[in-house]
Each structure stands twice: as structure tokens, then as C-alpha cells.
Amino acid sequence: MSKLSEIEALLFVAGEDGLKVRQIAEILSIPPTGVSQSLEKLTAKYEADADCSLALLETSNTYKLVTKQAFAELLRAYSKSPINQSLSRAALETLSIIAYKQPITRVEIDDIRGVNSSGALAKLLAFELVREDGKKEVLGRPNLYVTTEYFLDYMGINHLEELPVVTDTELVAEESQLFGQATESELE
């Protein structure tokens, strides 16, 4: 592993905050002049590589990795895409219910939430976090909903089993907190 790649990794993890030369020097136990030379090499490397989307930005002796100006329009379009917008509380509640109770119908979701979930469900379907997965074999044959592979990616997990274990008691307590109601145990 080269010092150059170590500096690059540190700058990547530092994100928008960036790092000062002295911080990098302390972390890597090298003199600040060595860090400055490596930063110059990294800048030259990014500038020379037309296929690289990264650039090194220095402001007030703080360095950070940024995307090259040439990608501004692309990134603006991405930031306006629907999935990059945050999910509403209703959508998050609905998504949680589907994740833990799938396959589940909209009416069953409504019963748990106590309100109509059609809007939240439509948003989750549009974002491809959930999908229809057949029909429930009851009167009216309502659609069943399950989470998608994209949901797993969005949550940063590989399998549904990696979701935190939540007991029914915790769900009731959480729901009562959400809706300002007291559970039986709180009333005793």
C-alpha cells in the first residue's frame, strides 16, 4: 500500500470536511512536506486521467476529494432524481411494516398504521423499494407487497435476516410512541 493510496483513502473517508496537511501527517506518521508532495502527485494523477471523475480541492490548507466540474450536470440530474429525496415518515413507517411483515396487503398495513397508506405505498413502489408479489387468497384477492433487492441495497444489508430483531412488545411500544398512545403496561 503506497502513501498516495493511503492519503486518497483518508480523503475519501473524510468526505466534505476534508483534512489538513498536518492531520494527514499525524495519522500517517510522515512529515508534512511528504504529505504535500503526495497531494501534488495525487492532483496531477487526477488531472492526467480523463477517465477519472475525481479531483483534489484545496481550500485554506484543507484538502478534499470532489468530482470534476465536467460532471456537474450529471450530478445535478442525479440529485433531482426521486430516490435521492428523503422518504416521509409515513413512507418509512409503511416500509418498516412491509419489511417485517411481508408479504402483506395494503389493508393489513392500514390496520397496523391506523391510517390509509396508499400514498406512502405508491411512493415506495415508484422508488422500487417494494413490489407487488402476487395476490392474497381471500375475498377480493388484494395485492401482496414485499421488499425488493433495491431495498436491501438501500438499507445496506444482504438479507432480511440482518434487520434488527423487533419483538411484538417493542412494536407496540414504538407504535404508541409514534401515535402518542399509552400501552397497557404504561397504564399499570
UniProtKB/Swiss-Prot annotation:
UniProt subcellular location: Cytoplasm
Keyword Acyltransferase on entry: no
UniProt keyword annotations, A-Z: Cell cycle, Cell division, Chromosome partition, Cytoplasm
Domain of life: Bacteria
Cellular component per GO, a single term: cytoplasm
Signal peptide (from-to): none
Entries under InterPro entries matching the protein: ScpB_csome_segregation, WH-like_DNA-bd_sf, WH_DNA-bd_sf
Cell cycle keyword on record: yes
GO terms classed as biological process: cell division; chromosome separation; DNA replication
Subunit and interaction comment: Homodimer. Homodimerization may be required to stabilize the binding of ScpA to the Smc head domains. Component of a cohesin-like complex composed of ScpA, ScpB and the Smc homodimer, in which ScpA and ScpB bind to the head domain of Smc. The presence of the three proteins is required for the association of the complex with DNA.
Job of this protein: Participates in chromosomal partition during cell division. May act via the formation of a condensin-like complex containing Smc and ScpA that pull DNA away from mid-cell into both cell halves.
Family: Belongs to the ScpB family.
Protein name: Segregation and condensation protein B
Organism: Streptococcus gordonii (strain Challis / ATCC 35105 / BCRC 15272 / CH1 / DL1 / V288)
